[in-house]
Amino acid sequence: MLMTGSVGDGSEFDWEDQKTFISRDGGLTWRFVHNSSGLYATGDLGNIIVYIPYDPEEDGDFQSEFYYSLDQGRTWNEYELTNAISSVHPYKLINPTPDGSGSKFIFKGTFATTDSETNSITSLKGVEYIIDFSAAFDSRTCEEEDFEDWDLADGKCVNGAKYKYRRRKQDAQCLVKKAFKDLSLDETPCNSCGESDYECSFEFVRDANGLCIPDYNLIAFSNICDKSKDKSVLVEPLQLIKGDECKTPMKIEPVDIPCDEIPEEGSSDREIVTTENKFDFEIKFYQYFDTVADESLVMLNSIGDAYISHDGGQTIKRFDTNGEKIVEVVFNPYFNSSAYLFGSKGNIFSTHDRGHSFMIAKLPEARQLGMPLDFSAKAQDTFIYYGGKNCESILSPECHAVAYLTKDGGETFTEMLDNAIHCEFAGTLFEYPSNEEMVMCQVKKKSSETRSLVSSIDFFQGDNKIIFENIIGYLSTGGYIIVAVPHEDNELRAYVTIDGTEFAEAKFPYGQDVSKQEAFTILGSEKGSIFLHLATNLESGHDFGNLLKSNSNGTSFVTLEHAVNRNTFGYVDFEKVQGLEGIIITNIVSNREKVGENKEDEQLKTKITFNDGSDWNFLKPPKKDSEGKKFPCDSVSLDKCSLHLHGYTERKDIRDTYSSGSALGMMFGVGNVGDKLLPYEECSTFLTTDGGETWTEVKKGPHQWEYGDHGGVLVLVPENAETDSISYSTDFGKTWKDYKFCGDKVLVKDIITVPRDSALRFLLFGEAKNMGSGSFRTYTIDFRNIFERQCEFDITGKKRADFKYSPLGSRTGCLFGHQTEFLRKTDEKCFIGNIPLSEFSRNVKNCSCTRQDFECDYNFYKASDGTCKLVKGLSSANGADICKKEPDLIEYYDSSGYRKIPLSTCKGGLKLDAHLAPHPCPGKEKAFREKYSINTGAYALVFVTILLVIFFAAWFVYDRGIRRNGGFSRFEEIRLGDDGLIENNRTDRVVNIIVRLGLCISLITKSAFQRTKAGVARFSSKLRARFGNRKGPTYSSLLQGQFSDESDGLHEDANDLSSFTSQDSNFEIEQEDAYRPEQEHTSQIDQPATSNIPDALPARSAIHKPDSTAVRNEDE
């Protein structure tokens, strides 16, 4: 067999990496043939093999060649086509003998003719060769002694028999020269049957130890109990593989299956199948491979035994390590089929096919330190391992960490950097890296108390650049690397880079609650912003701080919310809803002043934002609980009565998030309705299906939850309580059913499914108290059979309407500058499967910008009236800083107080971030003046030209229409329609029309003036007659600054929204249909109104419109 392929797990394919291999034992073993791909053909029953590379220049010369072997692929010879045209590209290679027994081959290819002067291709031509091997070995024909017997599978039994085949010896110097005949295999049945000759009977499946155990779902299908009148039946768990030829069967003990444990016909839950597996030791670690190929996962128990399952835990096999215990399991975050198991004896077991196969390699001779691996985001086999060198003991003076690099998946390691404790392949993380080979490492020498940050572009073979001499630590997120650097007075500073070379200090906003930057937590990044929590109170057990958000390059932060809860370990009650833009849930400390003074314990309240942190609201509570009763609090104010949820800081497993990336809009949470968050055990379980807009209490008491089939199956199990049942819903939480999954009550510690939440199988980890051996158990609950069919996916809507596009909740308007609809299932009787619904959302339309598309800029805060005002005593960001970052700029702008939310795609409409007047960058004053200076010479020329045209036209009309007709002295004598004017041609007539028109306008103006003057005189006379007894005139003064406002300046507090409206659009804030979530503090600007100006601001009309009464008094 000759094949083209590559060595790997099959997850990647690249034609440039394809090589050619050969096997002469039916594919059992393979040998390398050539470092390229090409055409191949065989002759003389496989004794002649011809191979031609697709690229004739792969060997470095232009001469075309082919390769051949006469010893069944052991050795190869090159034959150059010396008389041929160079660079012939093959497209066909065949043995013209139909059965492949001939010794001649036909090779067809193409070559290009080029122009000798321009070296360009002028035409393509075909060429054909006949390759003849009939004279090989001096035309000697093989005899009987040139043949041998070949045993299939190295003589092992295959399907109960051994097989032999007669073929030419590999080193025989002859050709067979016989026509092909059907294979005549010498078959010898094996005497005794072995385990390899058997498979599980239909009613059984294999468990973790490879034993066949009853599957009651299959038993129900087989109807074996219906054929028996007894309460139980005996069934052999093994059956001989069909077609197996072994003679003596194994003795198989039948299994007694109780028929009363089989679900009866008509049971509502008969299609739900539960598979139980028992363990003597607790399962401490478990994780799925994040793929759609199957439901593979790795589990590790408390004594270091590893288990593999490929069907969601139904069948579990113990991983054979030859007695070596597994101390750690690490998954590759960039390549979802790869994982690494570290053995206690220094071996590393790696898989790149989700645990179907493993490769074993030896770790470097170093002590395992338990530090996580660091992987390359672009090379699957490249990662960094950290080991301890000179470590007889961790406390040894010479013991230190060493970073080891592997580029072949762990088969070989090279020592990369001493004292490195954390490295990252920075060049693979940035969108636009300065060098793709860049590696950054944090170095901690044992003799020093400080840590430094270094980088290299050759894995520290020669290049070693120190970036920071002293750091606290660093991490990467979403295309950024953030470094925490100590500062004077026990403060911290954060530096950010987006290319690995240029670092800029992150500017945090200052306020009354931020006195020092002592601790911060990076919460992640998404679409051009970093979310960060800056601690403002570090009292143990009473920690909280401000939630910040950066601009696109991560250097300028603004405050989104104050007093956001954190714990002593730096974890924060902050969670972005998966799959939906801009929805974040946080818990705030509502009594932060008294907590800061140690007078009260923390009182937490839950808030949500629908526009990426610009506006926050309390959660709307449901009207009734799961029993149909009203909640104790019914205040209209959400500040006094809202829903509160326990957050990230209290989770046992950080993977248990509120939401799911595939069940769009759905979130579970444990909480309560009231004025503050109650203790966990006093709370209930709530569900939302519209992204947090509305909530429903689904179960009393705390529950664990899991999503399946993109939210088509929802499962709840009681938390911290023994149970034998789960609750599930197949209609998105509208109704719930209970299902009993085991006979004895167990304490369920966790419920999981595949990371994409698309499977119909759920895996529960439980512990049965007082059960002795086998008290630790897993239960795989399979919902695959409860649906009638799989949903038909057709986004065109021409077929069955199992899906439709719809908005999320009531938000039918614009959000982040666009209106989005999501694809959702309409028929509850079908299941979705692996269809990636989250990838099929669509933007219905783009929208004009409104106030909701902007957030406050650096050192600005959002006031109660919805405007952004400058923090008292602070200044806006120095716009000139951008000149340092971009040396080619010649100008910069001051901040308007607003900046556009990075998620927003709006166009036109409100322009709150519009630039003010430009300023020259330092040192670019001359270029600035040249750009904006007026060209006086050009303007003077235009002005003079216009004056000359006007003067010439006036002189022409005067000369031809006035002077020639008697001059100005006759002007008053001319009447309209007078024929006394001279008109000798068309020009005279046009000039006279202009003269008459001027006369008409002059007379009308004069008459209007005289009438107005007479009317004013009469009115004045009447006033004097009526008020003549007054002592004298009175006046009313209007002071210049009477109605001015200190906040009227745009640069200082940016509070006049109307001045930003686009000149070419009539869009207004109140006229937008965009969704506006209810505000905690309602402001005029966020409500429908008839005015463009917030109530808190002075009306512009009152400033610029004169008071009619005042004017009238002044005219007296």
From Swiss-Prot:
- Recorded superkingdom: Eukaryota
Which InterPro entries does the entry mention?
Sortilin_C, Sortilin_N, VPS10, VPS10-sortilin, WD40/YVTN_repeat-like_dom_sf
Q: Name one Pfam family in it.
A: Sortilin_C
Sorted alphabetically, the keyword list is: Glycoprotein, Membrane, Repeat, Transmembrane, Transmembrane helix
Q: Quick one: a GO biological-process term for this protein? A: Golgi to vacuole transport
Compositional bias annotation for Basic and acidic residues: 1073-1083
Question: Cross-referenced SMART domains, in alphabetical order?
Answer: VPS10
Q: Per the annotation, which location comes first and is thus the protein's main one?
A: membrane
What residues form the membrane-spanning segments?
934-957
Q: What membrane topology is given? A: Single-pass membrane protein
GO CC field = cytosol; endoplasmic reticulum; Golgi apparatus; membrane
The annotated regions of Polar residues compositional bias extend over 1084-1093
**Record's subcellular location:** Membrane
Placement of BNR repeats on the sequence:
21-32, 67-78, 307-318, 404-415, 607-618, 686-697, 727-738
- Read off the SUPFAM superfamilies from this record: Oligoxyloglucan reducing end-specific cellobiohydrolase (SSF110296)
Instruction: Give the region (Disordered) as residue ranges.
Output: 1069-1116
* Protein name stated in the entry: Uncharacterized membrane glycoprotein YNR065C
Q: What is the lineage of its organism?
A: Eukaryota, Fungi, Dikarya, Ascomycota, Saccharomycotina
